[in-house]
């Protein structure tokens, strides 16, 4: 397996960024981690790729803070619930989706922190 991609970014210290792809659904999943703290987030997890994603998170020693769904998915089944069960991470999704079992219902302007970094929620049409 290739070494993690590290990039200097706002917030200080290296940022781990991994782009993962599920060919069956055409879905990109993103793993971001604040390297100094070891905390990270997973964005748009795919149900069928849970084992791959969990293996990578464990291999890199990341403490997963949240599994974030950018929208309610018609193109694939989310893997966020499985990731929550495996790691205890929060499940984050737009409050307007009306989904149950979401621990972080998100609205425009919310922030999701991991280590010394944060993502800002931007509602889009």
List PLM regions with ranges:
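Conserved beta-strand hairpin/beta-sheet module of binuclear metal-dependent hydrolase folds
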Residues: 6-64
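Glycine-centered loop/turn motifs
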Residues: 5-6, 109
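Active-site HxH/HxHxD metal-binding segment of metal-dependent hydrolases
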Residues: 26, 47-123
């Amino acid at each position: 397996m290739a070494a993690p991609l590290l990039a200097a970014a706002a917030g200080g210290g290296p940022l781990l960024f991994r782009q993962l792809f599920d060919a069956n659904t055409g879905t990109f999943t993103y793993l971001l981690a604040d390297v100094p703290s070891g905390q990270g987030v997973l964005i748009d997890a795919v149900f069928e790729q849970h084992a791959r994603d969990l293996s990578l998170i464990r291999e890199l020693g990341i403490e997963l803070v949240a599994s974030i769904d950018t929208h309610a998915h018609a193109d694939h089944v989310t893997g966020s619930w499985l990731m929550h069960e495996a790691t205890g991470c929060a499940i984050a999704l737009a409050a307007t989706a009306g989904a149950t079992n979401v621990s972080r219902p998100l609205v425009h302007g919310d922030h999701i922190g991991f280590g010394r970094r944060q993502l800002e929620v931007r509602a889009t049409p």
